[in-house]
Regions:
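Extended, non-globular alpha-helical segments
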Residues: 1-15, 45, 126
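A Rossmann-like FAD-binding core segment of flavoenzymes
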Residues: 2-10, 88-114, 118-119, 181-279, ...
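FAD-site-proximal beta/loop scaffold in flavoenzymes
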Residues: 5-14, 21, 131, 136, ...
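Beta1-alpha1 glycine-rich phosphate/pyrophosphate-binding loop at the start
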Residues: 16-91, 162-163, 174-200, 270, ...
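Conserved phosphate-binding and hydrolysis motifs of nucleotide-dependent enzymes
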Residues: 28-33, 129, 168-170, 292
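Glycine/small-residue-rich loop that forms an oxyanion/phosphate-binding "nest" at active or ligand-binding sites
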Residues: 95-160
Length: 334
């Protein structure tokens, strides 16, 4: 059931230069957040977008994007996100390239803090995304976008007729490996334990596929190469024995973590930490909406995140109109 948040009866005691009040705040600047900003700006809401210290989302570490509509020749991830940003700014969005460190969604206007600076917003769109879980190796970081990936759907095409490895033992890893069989000549699954954790049907499919080989009790200790990946250093978790594996690509598939720590105890989260919605993009709190991978653990694509951002902006604008924060004549017919 949606909670009706009462308007605040007190005004924060801050200097006007430190307190900023907008009709709409958008937390996050990936495809969802910036699409929301584009639509909200066109509705004259002049949204403030909190882009974070590492702005523009996961596509900033994606080399070639070939599945986003409108770019038949493909486009570099950073270039695509810069176009998103430019379009949002063109229509009147303000970007704050710092992280929101605290929020109070208990009353309206909602309160957000960036360090010691406080911001107020009549509505909020949460578009903080989800981060792939990585192995944490310095060499892994070095080769991201140059043979190391966490998205088979995004990057699998670039490994046609190559030998690659997939790290992980759950459904995510099994799904990624099976998807990659469309492109790669051979896939070696590297599993830390002596068994998969994924569903039986997914295991059966992997075991039956001629392109998939499995190495149990195996972890990656180093990613090696020159310009791109060409070898993995491995360790047997049972015996400690070290070995190497020649591959041209490494896919990390050990799961995702939604970036929702900021909202714990205020928004409803599922057991994995993803935001729950009650209808469309609405949360249990009136005036708070979500978009993108912060609640979508199924698709996780730039185009679906952008669609979510569009919906969240329209939902937020209509809600602001319904509570009298904007005049009906201000509303856009899109």
């Amino acid at each position: 059931m949606t909670a009706t948040v009462p308007p605040s009866t007190d005004t924060p005691a801050h200097d006007a230069t430190e307190t900023r009040h907008r009709k709409l705040a958008i937390i996050g600047s990936g495809p969802a957040g910036l699409t929301a900003a584009i639509y909200a700006s066109r509705a004259n809401l002049e949204p403030m977008v909190f882009a974070g210290n590492t702005p523009l989302g996961q596509l900033m570490i994606t080399s070639d994007v070939e599945n986003y509509p409108g770019f038949p020749g493909g486009i570099q991830g950073p270039e695509l996100m810069q176009l998103f940003r430019d379009q949002a700014v063109r229509f009147g969005s303000t970007l704050v390239e710092r992280d929101v460190t605290r929020v109070d969604l208990s009353q309206r206007p909602f309160r957000l803090w960036v360090g010691d600076d406080e911001y107020l917003a009549d509505a909020v769109i949460v578009a903080t995304g989800a981060s792939a879980l990585w192995l944490g190796l310095p060499s892994e970081e070095h080769f991201r976008g140059r043979g190391v990936s966490a998205c088979a759907t995004c990057d699998g095409f670039f490994f046609r007729d190559r030998e690659i490895a997939v790290v992980g033992g759950g459904d995510t890893a099994l799904e990624e490996a099976l998807f990659l069989t469309r492109f790669a000549s051979k896939i070696t699954m590297l599993v830390r334990r002596d068994a998969f954790r994924g569903s039986k049907i997914m295991q059966d499919r992997a075991f039956a596929h001629p392109k998939i080989d499995v190495r149990w009790n195996t972890e990656v200790t180093e990613v090696r190469g020159e310009m791109t990946v060409n070898e993995l250093a491995l360790r047997d978790t049972a015996s400690g024995e070290e070995s190497t594996l020649a591959v041209q690509g490494l896919f990390i598939a050990i799961g995702y973590k939604p970036n929702t720590d900021l909202f714990a105890g205020q928004l409803d989260l599922d057991p994995r930490g993803y935001c729950l919605v009650e209808s469309g993009t609405r949360t249990k709190i009136d005036g708070v909406f979500v978009a993108g991978d912060v609640h979508d653990h199924l698709y996780r694509q730039a185009v679906t995140a952008a669609g979510d951002g569009c919906k969240a902006a329209i939902d937020a604008e209509r809600w602001l109109e319904s509570v009298g924060e904007i005049e009906a004549s201000t509303a856009t017919n899109w």
